[in-house]
Amino acid sequence: MSVETQKETLGFQTEVKQLLHLMIHSLYSNKEIFLRELISNASDAVDKLRFEALSKPELLEGGAELKIRVSFDKDAKTVTLEDNGIGMSREDVITHLGTIAKSGTADFMKNLSGDQKKDSHLIGQFGVGFYSAFIVADQVEVFSRRAGTPANEGVHWSSKGEGEFEVATVDKADRGTRIVLHLKNGEEEFADGYRLRNIIKKYSDHIALPIELPKEQAPAAEGEEVPALEWETVNRASALWTRPRTEVKDEEYQEFYKHVAHDYENPLSWSHNKVEGKLEYTSLLYVPARAPFDLYQREAPRGLKLYVQRVFVMDQAESFLPLYMRFVKGVVDSNDLSLNVSREILQKDPIIDSMKSALTKRVLDMLEKLAKNEPEQYKGFWKNFGQVLKEGPAEDFANKEKIAGLLRFASTSDDSGEQSVSLAEYLARAKEGQDKIYYLTGESYAQVKNSPHLEVFRKKGIEVLLLTDRIDEWLMSYLSDFDGKGFVDVARGDLDLGNLDSEEDKKAQEEIAKDKEGLIERLKAALGESVSEVRVSHRLTDSPAILAIGEQDMGLQMRQILEASGQKVPDSKPIFEFNPAHPLIGKLDAEQSEERFGDLSHILFDQAALSAGDSLKDPAAYVRRLNKLLVELSV
């Protein structure tokens, strides 16, 4: 054994301690996944060596065949996994094995609940890789040397998973990494060739380089020389995406997803496609079953694994799919790109634009198929990724109609509040003569469901979509129509129901408006600069008044988003609409005292603002006027 120098003991990052605690206390019922995780890491290390060796062939140090070896020692109760990939320096080891250098760590830790089943899903999403070794081991040793560094710059890392680790410099002749697991009592089953072989075949058959185990050998007879150790490859060792679809089982696709996405759950859907002709490439795209922690961080790492002629080039190649598809995982293998392609080149290459367009359509087709054939599965997709898909119409004009068809909304058709109504379903239920798609945005389902803006629609039996996500008003600014039918915000402008209003209704509305001209003028004078206009409402049947938004004005949702982010909000004033048939409006019209008329007008205005989900500019004045009115009524 080589002499250790520069030995030091260091503490784990707090988040790592928490993870290790969960591991050591048997969070996983399926312990065998530790081997899948370690093999996946080893495969990544070999991929990185292949890529770096394109420009620095000396890193191959003689060009030994790239492979992963798994061995065991029953007597010592150890399992050893070794790769001849890129390896790690002392600094790499401290960084990668002592901390979690990943965005969203704090959010991830906040979400841990103590519920083992739930937490296993969360940890699965987060991806723990190396730390899974502590599921079966009470001590883990790592010996590594980075390719291209001298043999005396190897590193030895060791930990019992209790809060600290030791690291020392050692001699290591071969580049790459060797991990030795000292199995816990009760985990001896893993120091067995048959067991390890089955685990590798089950989880890692798709890994595109040989995974070797020692060949089973008959024990040497007494006096005979012990034969030299022979190794045999136990996996297919071919890139899964290069095989014909008909030869790949669903289970293989699922295991490959777990490898490429570092996820513990099966994907929701996948699409495997080979393109030949002007462009030649193969893609294997997956839609996950759950959202990652950093889904709403638009600057978080994303993208596909990029291979060029089956040689790994880069992780997180973001140029192949638009930002609103950042949840998609998978690989793309091109025959047309150069092996020395860079991220900067990817952003400017016309070949990439063509591939991006085709891959985007393929994902949308996959989602359409899921929505049509597996509606319950699509509900799960929408719950996890719907808000991100809503970014699509603004980013991807060419596919706007296709994306719109995948959107789901709550509506007045039921009281569940569930976002399950597609635009096609809405139009299929539309009233005869209805040529518009009506919607209302707001802060919450309860607020929009009970909004006075819906009264005339309920009376006439017209369905209205209820939009309550913060992104919705912004989304609708990019959707002008669907299937030839325009969108109408029922809280905006002067409501026109078109053919759904009879000529008699329209004539009656005009006569009432003319009859109430005097009241309109009095209200304008009383409300003054608070409003842009006062008019008789065509929307109301039960409430006395509402506030409408000007046709070109910014809606409440967008105003609140801008205010919250500290941005300047354009000035605008609401339109005050009143219901001439309401008793309160009748009393208001008959009020002789201008002071009392003014108080009542402002109370109605403030109540209309509250019912729209807005906050009052002067709550104290509202309370004062209301108390004054209550005192007068109680006398």
From Swiss-Prot:
Residues 344-560 are annotated as: B. Keywords: ATP-binding, Chaperone, Cytoplasm, Nucleotide-binding, Stress response. InterPro entries: HATPase_C_sf (IPR036890), Heat_shock_protein_90_CS (IPR019805), HSP90_C (IPR037196), Hsp90_fam (IPR001404), Hsp90_N (IPR020575), Ribosomal_Su5_D2-typ_SF (IPR020568). Gene3D superfamilies: 3.30.230.80, 3.40.50.11260, Heat shock protein 90, C-terminal domain, Histidine kinase-like ATPase, C-terminal domain. Residues 561-635 are annotated as: C. Pfam families: HATPase_c_3, HSP90. CDD domains: HATPase_Hsp90-like. It is found in: Cytoplasm. It comes from the Bacteria. Residues 1-343 are annotated as: A. One of its GO terms (molecular function) is ATP binding. GO terms for cellular component: cytoplasm. Molecular chaperone. Has ATPase activity. Belongs to the heat shock protein 90 family. HAMAP family: HSP90. Homodimer. This is Chaperone protein HtpG. It comes from Pseudomonas savastanoi pv. phaseolicola (strain 1448A / Race 6). The gene is htpG.
